[in-house]
Amino acid sequence: MSIRILVTGGTFDKEYDELTGRLYFRDTHLDEMLRRGRSRLDLAVETVMMIDSLEMDDRGRAQIVARCRAAAEPAIVITHGTDTMVETARALAEAGLAGKTIVLTGAMVPYAFGSSDGLFNLGSALSFVQVLPPGVYVAMNGRHFPWDAVRKNRETGVFEVSP
C-alpha cells in the first residue's frame, strides 16, 4: 500500500531559536522522523504549506482538500497543527473524498525538542491509515477518532471523544 503524507506545518515542524526564544518554521522534520523510526513504508511526501494552525483558514483547507482529491494514493496522512486540526478534518469529510482514508496528526511539543510526541503520533497515524476504513480521522496520543467525535481538551493537552 502506498501512502501520501501531506505536510502543513504546525507545532510538529517548528524550530526553536535559542537567542530569541521564539518558535519558527524552517523545513519539515518528516524525512528525519521516518529515518529515525526505520520506516519501510511506500511513502510519497508532499509539503503543502508550513503554517501555524491558528493561521489556517478556508483557503488553506481548500488547498489540503485539493491535494487529497488529486492524490493517487487511497491512504493519506496529514501533519497539522493541533489547534485547528478538527476544523480541517471537518472540511475534508464534507468534501466527500470517497474511497480515501485520511488521518490527521500533529504534536503538542515540537519534534526539535527531545520530549516531543510527534514521532509517536506520526507512527500511530501511519499504522491507523493502513487499517481503518475510508473516512476522515484524527490520530493523537495513541488513539484514533472519527472526525466528528473528537475534540482537543485544552486543559489536559490531549485529544478525546467529544461530548
What is the role of each PLM region?
Residues 1-163:
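Active-site histidine-anchored catalytic micro-motif
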